[in-house]
A protein has these predicted regions:
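Short, amphipathic alpha-helical interaction segments positioned at domain boundaries
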Residues: 105-134
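A broad, structure-centric signal for solvent-exposed, well-ordered loop/edge residues
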Residues: 14, 18, 27, 63, ...
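Compositionally biased, intrinsically disordered low-complexity regions enriched in proline and serine
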Residues: 7, 18, 29, 58-59, ...
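Winged helix-turn-helix DNA-binding recognition segment
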Residues: 36-103
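Residue-level marker of intrinsically disordered, low-complexity segments enriched
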Residues: 2-5, 9, 65, 85, ...
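A broadly tuned preference for mixed-charge, low-complexity surface segments
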Residues: 31-33, 79, 128-133
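Short recognition helix of helix-turn-helix/winged-helix DNA-binding domains
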Residues: 1-58
């Protein structure tokens, strides 16, 4: 695992980045740190090898950054809405099925007609509530 994380200059100067909350920036940086970058050909062209396979769980983020679960959820919503990440697989936390994420470039077109809007799919399952402790 590398000690280096690549962030494009355009990203932090973009209108989409300026709308991020502090918690969303922390979560975005954690996603970017989990990318596996590989060089393609002789040119300086890099691609994300594990795009769509990046896992970041509620348990990890709350332990590492002491961010509340609701804050993490709101950060995911904001990162998807502004075009920084996409959800490749919606996991079901109770079944130990983790969500998988991909780094997106949609943020480049944020505020333009070409911007593709996405949002996190809401969980409408009627899951039973955990039994209360008496």
């Amino acid at each position: 695992m590398s000690d280096v994380m690549f962030i494009q200059k355009r990203m932090h100067r973009s209108p989409a980045f300026r709308e991020l909350t502090a918690s969303s920036i922390l979560v975005l940086l954690e996603f970017l740190s989990r990318r596996q970058m590989v060089k393609i050909g002789r040119r300086d062209r890099w691609v994300t090898k594990n795009n769509g396979e990046i896992v970041l769980t509620y348990t990890e983020i709350t332990a590492k950054f002491r961010i509340a679960r609701s804050t993490f959820r709101n950060s995911i919503d904001q990162l998807v809405k502004l075009g920084f990440i996409d959800i490749a697989h919606h996991g079901g936390g109770m079944m130990k099925d983790c969500s998988k994420y991909g780094i997106s470039e949609r943020w480049r077109n944020y505020g333009k007609e070409a911007f593709i809007k996405k949002s996190r799919k809401k969980d409408n399952r009627n899951l039973p509530l955990a039994p209360s402790i008496r």
